[in-house]
C-alpha cells in the first residue's frame, strides 16, 4: 500500500490517511508530509459546529446528527425515528438561533450542548414524547463539554494550515481500543477530508486502512453516505 499511496502523491493527488500502526511514518517523512499522532496531551481536535451559513446543508446536518448520536448511543446503539428527528430539529434550531436570531454568541459544541439540554425537554413536552433517555443524553455529552475529560475534542478549531498540506497521516493507534474515541476521531478526520476536498480542486484520496473497524456499524454507515455525496459531486 505504501508504494500505491506514494505513486498517487507523485501524480499530484492530495493524500489523507488514518493509520493505526505507524505503517506510514517513513513514507510521510520521505515526502515531507504532516504526521499527526493522537496523544492524551495533544488530541486531534475540531470544532464541527463552526461553519458558515452557506455550509449548512443536509450533509452537514447529517454529519452533526451522527456525531451527537455516536456520543449518546455508541457505535452499536439503536436510534429511534423519534430520537433521530428530535436531534435533527435541535441542530437546525441551534443554527437558526445563531444565524437568524443572533441569540448564540459563537458556534461550538459547548454552546450546542447548552442550547440542547434546555431545548430538548421543551420539545419533548410540546409534542408529548416518551421513551427518550434525557438523563443519559445530558450525562454522556457532558464529557465533551467544558470541564469534561474530552472538553477540547469538539471545541478547539483545527489548524487550517493542514488544508495546504498534500500528504497528511493521522496516527490514532493509542485510541484504537477505545469504543467511543476511536470512531469519533475517525469521523473528525473524515470531515477534515471533506473540507479539504471542497477547498482544493486537484484529486484527493482518503485512506482509512485498519481504521475501517471504527466505522463498521449501521449507525456509521449513514455517515459514509454523507461522505460519498460530495465526493460524487466533486468527481
Question: What is each of the regions a protein language model found here?
Answer:
Residues 22-34, 40, 47-233:
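P-loop NTPase motor domains
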Residues 6-16, 31-34:
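Post-Walker A helix-loop "phosphate-sensing" segment adjacent to the P-loop in P-loop NTPases
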Residues 1-5:
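Glycine-rich phosphate-binding P-loop
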Residues 19:
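Conserved functional hotspot residues or short segments at active or partner-binding sites
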Amino acid at each position: 500500500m505504501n508504494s500505491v499511496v506514494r505513486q498517487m502523491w507523485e501524480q499530484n493527488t492530495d493524500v489523507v490517511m488514518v493509520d493505526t500502526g505507524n505503517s506510514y511514518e517513513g513514507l510521510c517523512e520521505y515526502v515531507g508530509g504532516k504526521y499527526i499522532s493522537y496523544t492524551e496531551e495533544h488530541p486531534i481536535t475540531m470544532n464541527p459546529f463552526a461553519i458558515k451559513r452557506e455550509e449548512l446543508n443536509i450533509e452537514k446536518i447529517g454529519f452533526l446528527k451522527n456525531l451527537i448520536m455516536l456520543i449518546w448511543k455508541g457505535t452499536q446503539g439503536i436510534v429511534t425515528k423519534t430520537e433521530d428527528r428530535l436531534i435533527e430539529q435541535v441542530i437546525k434550531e441551534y443554527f437558526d438561533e445563531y444565524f437568524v436570531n443572533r441569540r448564540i454568541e459563537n458556534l461550538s459544541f459547548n454552546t450546542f450542548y447548552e442550547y440542547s439540554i434546555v431545548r430538548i425537554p421543551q420539545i419533548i413536552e410540546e409534542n408529548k414524547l416518551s421513551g427518550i433517555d434525557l438523563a443519559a443524553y445530558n450525562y454522556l455529552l457532558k464529557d465533551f463539554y467544558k470541564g469534561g475529560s474530552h472538553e477540547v475534542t469538539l471545541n478547539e478549531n483545527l489548524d487550517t494550515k493542514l488544508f495546504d498540506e498534500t500528504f497528511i497521516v493521522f496516527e490514532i493507534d493509542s485510541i484504537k481500543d477505545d469504543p467511543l474515541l476511536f470512531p469519533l476521531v475517525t469521523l473528525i478526520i473524515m470531515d477534515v477530508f471533506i473540507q479539504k476536498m471542497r477547498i482544493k480542486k486537484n484529486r484527493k484520496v482518503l485512506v482509512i486502512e485498519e481504521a475501517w473497524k471504527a466505522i463498521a456499524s449501521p449507525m456509521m454507515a449513514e455517515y459514509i453516505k454523507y461522505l460519498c455525496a460530495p465526493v460524487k459531486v466533486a468527481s
